[in-house]
Design a protein with these regions (language model features):
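Short, acidic, metal-binding catalytic loop of nucleotide-sugar glycosyltransferases
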Residues: 26-35
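A conserved acidic beta->alpha catalytic loop
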Residues: 42-50, 94-95
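Glycine-rich, basic loop-to-helix element that forms the pyrophosphate-binding segment
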Residues: 65-82
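Conserved donor NDP-sugar-binding/catalytic core segment of glycosyltransferases
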Residues: 95, 99-135
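A recurrent flexible, glycine/aromatic-enriched loop bordering the glycosyltransferase active site
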Residues: 151-175
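Acidic donor-binding loop at a coil-to-helix junction in glycosyltransferase catalytic cores
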Residues: 190-196
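Non-catalytic, C-terminal membrane-associated alpha-helical segments of glycosyltransferases
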Residues: 229-235, 239, 246-327
Length: 327
């Protein structure tokens, strides 16, 4: 790696992100380490996302029909246009937490064996974002964690260990372009990032996690999205890692903690606090329903699990673009 001046391409798949895309692009352009190019794959936006992107000379826009979008293949398409030594993947409704996001991603490439570095998502303090998820750092001490296994070692890991090692997130991740060419994302309706992490590890590469490489990213979820996201995530984690998870349970103490967090959020009115308490209650119930259907289907065998996944998640979960308390 050319530490003095690495070349970096950014790839962003988007659709109808007019409300947030400028914050995303401006955040990238304000980084302490500049990028070579920003490649945006737009899959049929019907708002003015594309028009806003045309204001930036550094942005290359590739337009595809919405029916051609796929979580894995669309990202591969973006990578095929990239010229940088490194490729960052993010999304149009995310923005860097600070101007050292790229620097912190690069910091993980201190070993030639590292194929990619992943950061974390955090939720910005805003009354339209779930206050239970607001980023409240307790400890500023962070460290880079690396995973590397032989194929035999990886296969001997428990499902929990596999899930932990592959908790990849391409909302905030940097890759060696050469590795993405060697190991592209699979065609899949969901979890393309976690599957890629497994493929990279099985191929003998090292992957790294740096919690200092943060982006702001948040989805206002309705019950249908939470249910589908829960079910499809469990499905793919089981298929690739053998992970079954545990049925979520909310204790009285858990409810009291949520109530306390919301109650102590001074930025919210009493009406807003009530809204967010009900919101979290509804999302927990939707998540629990996803777990229940997964568990019940799995007890009847893989065929039933595949059938239930097609039934409920044949159309992948799509997050809401609006996050209005009035909803």
């Amino acid at each position: 790696m050319n530490a003095s001046c690495p070349t970096i391409s950014v790839v962003i798949p988007v659709k109808n992100e007019a409300g947030k895309i400028k914050d995303c692009i401006e955040g990238i352009l304000s980084q302490s380490i500049p990028v070579l190019e920003i490649i945006v794959i737009d899959s049929g936006s019907t708002d003015n996302t594309v028009e806003l992107l045309r204001e930036y000379e550094i942005v290359k826009i590739v337009e595809i029909p919405s029916v051609e979008f796929n979580h894995g293949e669309t990202r591969n398409l973006g990578v095929s246009y990239a010229a940088g030594e490194f490729v960052i993947l993010t999304v149009g409704d995310a923005k860097p937490y600070d101007n050292h996001w790229i620097k912190n991603l690069l910091a993980g490439f201190d070993d030639e064996r590292v194929a990619g570095v992943c950061g974390i998502q955090v939720v910005e303090h805003h009354k339209n974002n779930n206050p239970v998820e607001w980023f409240r750092p307790v400890d500023k001490v962070t460290k880079i964690t690396k995973y590397a296994y032989s194929k035999d070692q990886f296969n001997k890991l428990s499902p929990d260990e596999k899930k932990q090692a592959c908790s990849w997130d391409d909302v905030t991740a940097m890759y060696k372009r050469s590795v993405l060419q060697e190991i592209p994302f699979r065609r899949t309706s969901y979890c393309e990032d976690a599957i890629w992490a497994q493929d990279a590890l099985l191929a003998g590469h090292t992957i790294a996690y740096n919690p200092s490489a943060r982006v702001y990213h948040y989805h206002f979820e309705n019950k249908d999205f939470t249910f589908k996201r829960t079910l499809t995530t469990l499905y793919f984690r089981y298929k690739y890692f053998g992970y079954k998870g545990d049925l979520p349970r909310r204790s009285l103490i858990g409810n009291m903690r949520i109530l306390k967090t919301i109650g102590q959020t001074s930025e919210l009115s009493l009406k807003e606090k009530y809204f967010w308490f009900q919101y979290n209650k509804n999302l927990f119930n939707a998540m629990r329903r996803g777990y229940q259907i997964f568990k019940e289907a799995l007890e009847q065998g893989e065929f039933k699990l595949d059938e239930e996944h097609r039934k409920y998640c044949g159309t992948p979960p799509i997050p809401l673009k609006a996050n209005l308390i009035s909803q």
